[in-house]
Amino acid sequence: MTRAPVSEGAAGAAGGGRAGGLWRNRDFTLLWTGQCLSDLGGAMVDLALPLLVLQQTGSPARAGLVGTVGLVTALVCRLPAGVLADRADRRRLMIACDALRLAGHALLGWAVVTGRASLPVILAVVVAGSAATAVFSTAEHASVRNLVRPDQLTSAVARNEARTYGVSLAGPPLGGLLFGLGRALPFLGNALSFLLSLAAVWRIRGPLQQPRREAAEPLGASTVQGLRFLLGHPFLRALLVIAAPLNMAFTGMIFAMTLALRRAGVSAPVVGLAGTIFALGGLLGAFAAPALQRRLRLPVLITLLCWATAALMTAGALLAGTVAAAVPLAAAVFLGPTANAALFAHQAAVTPDHLQGRVVGGVLLAAGSAAALAPALAGALLARWDPVPATLVFPALVTAAALTATLSRGIRTMSA
């Protein structure tokens, strides 16, 4: 059994005021809190922005275009973001990203108030904000292992998972409420969230990366170096093959379940309640992740979680089109954060600090691309087949991930 190497940054995090629980870790708490606020603002805008475009143009297609442009921009920026996160000072990089997002959403709020929020203005803000978010999130992922002790990595990643599910519960209702009170309020609120995130990152005292001794390589060579390490490491290869189908399966299954319920005549409030149950399952799973990992060796944990998720998703698919399908699917979502926490914490441990950004960028690109294709796949399957056979495609994807986890040398040699 191989043992994950301990980085200088992580080793340094064990001392100097970082002893004790994760909540007592000042720098990690600052980063987590700032991102929690900015993620909340982003979740508000994710709901408010299509509503604004629909109200401005009357075109659902244009409202969808805005979301697609943001998603494509984020995916295109993932690999360059990884190079930046490894080459630049991560703290300054995140501050610059927050400043850009703050300015963009303040400008958009002002444009809404003055009646100048044209589609080109909205698209410009979306492109700039999505690019900055891709860079910020990559730098944040790459920084975490320098802020916490090695034994806290899984808890730190699980806490980030909890943040994601928490804001997905609170953000859309808050965004809808603010949009109803005043169309500019969600965008001005998001600008405020970036200001608070900027202030939090500014106050971080510890280093977010190890010193760079080598001269920076050209962009292309740096990208190739990161991809070569990613594809050449047995565990990281397995992570790619597991994360991409899992992300596609979860995104596609939830989307397909929503469409199937609506086609079956289930009311919109009940469909919304099912979505809330999924998010609650993920939130509770994120809190349970550290305890589950303490009880099982990592290879056993990952393999067991993948097979259990495949079984639960299959049960949900067999109940597709009924509200009862929400129960096994919520249980599957409950397991997701534990798998993510174990996989990404181990990724942070085995990747050298000077490659963290590029490896994270590559993994997020693969997982994000797969998730982006999932709604289109779900819609095409439901257009051709009944809900049960259509949704069974997604547990089949999880089964492929489970087989990888079972057979992969990279998973078998994870640290206990």
PLM segments and residue spans:
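Alpha-helical transmembrane-bundle signature of multi-pass membrane transport and export proteins
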Residues: 1-416
